[in-house]
Amino acid sequence: MESYDIIANQPVVIDNGSGVIKAGFAGDQIPKYCFPNYVGRPKHMRVMAGALEGDLFIGPKAEEHRGLLTIRYPMEHGVVRDWNDMERIWQYVYSKDQLQTFSEEHPVLLTEAPLNPSKNREKAAEVFFETFNVPALFISMQAVLSLYATGRTTGVVLDSGDGVTHAVPIYEGFAMPHSIMRVDIAGRDVSRYLRLLLRKEGVDFHTSAEFEVVRTIKERACYLSINPQKDEALETEKVQYTLPDGSTLDVGPARFRAPELLFQPDLVGDESEGLHEVVAFAIHKSDMDLRRTLFANIVLSGGSTLFKGFGDRLLSEVKKLAPKDIKIKISAPQERLYSTWIGGSILASLDTFKKMWVSKKEYEEDGSRAIHRKTF
């Protein structure tokens, strides 16, 4: 196959989140595959031959046999900590269980959180070009893609996932790098805090597989209170949650106390800004002439914005930080769990995408410098 033909193939889009990896082909409406971005290794001794084969599990198989495994996330706060595991997960994305394709036949669009260490991007490029032999690669910022997915060119995107929360103001398609705000408080921190609160209520989850149970409780039972002080004074109605072993757990005030961490990171001794400040400060760091427009175009993206009551709480908090008569409008697209991937799918299927990527030839000539030249 001629190298040009390969470059003309449909690009693969990988939204490499700290918690969930979404993958599929450009031009598709939704990602073909989504699975937790972790690897599982058996923690017990195999005594029967011919039973469960393999020493490493990824994707649905890891979820299915979770109780038998030690679960490890290769990414923490948007940065890859274990490149061997990360490589294995990407390998699995191309395998017969997933995209069923050869990596050397498709250009790749990979997402990354803004203000990430440049080493992270260089290593990702090295893995894709040298191990997977991809013909071309483009690394894009998550928030910009989320805006693509909504069909706008102006807005401030608040993207809060499992590892990173960031706000990126974009005006008429121009991102303003100096105005970007990022904090490393996101969904996984809420899960950890919920585990601590549940321990205080008398239920202990200690293994890495049980931490996944806590994550599920968070997703199903937690909500954001519009007025936490008031809710603290009232008796919170307890919600019954059925655990995998059939026993039930009554979740009380922990339901709103855990996600409160997103707005008050000092609950766990973190000095970062809360989500509302992240948005407001990003807007305030932008030019005065643009602020009114940005306040009226706040777009939510990422799984941690899916808590019940999130939009109302954010609106009431941002109002306190904005000038008095300014109009604040927050839009929460329904598909915001996947909006980064959807934006990537749109961008990668445009003709102009070919001008943006770094080809294998450029990478071989310039090395990692080529990557920095073409990403922002």
UniProtKB/Swiss-Prot annotation:
Matches recorded under SMART domains: ACTIN
GO cellular component, one term: secretory granule lumen
Any single Pfam family the record assigns to this protein: Actin
InterPro entries, per the entry: Actin (IPR004000), Actin/actin-like_CS (IPR020902), Actin_CS (IPR004001), ATPase_NBD (IPR043129)
Annotated keywords: Acetylation, ATP-binding, Cytoplasm, Cytoskeleton, Nitration, Nucleotide-binding
Positions of modified residues (3'-nitrotyrosine): Y4
Domain of life: Eukaryota
Tagged with keyword ATP-binding: yes
Modified residues (N-acetylmethionine): M1
Places the protein is found: Cytoplasm, Cytoskeleton; Cytoplasm, Cytoskeleton, Microtubule organizing center, Centrosome
GO molecular function: ATP binding
UniProt xrefs under CDD domains: ASKHA_NBD_Arp1
Family: Belongs to the actin family. ARP1 subfamily.
Purpose: Component of a multi-subunit complex involved in microtubule based vesicle motility. It is associated with the centrosome.
PANTHER family: ACTIN
Protein name, entry field: Beta-centractin
Species in which this protein is naturally found: Homo sapiens (Human)
Name of the gene: ACTR1B
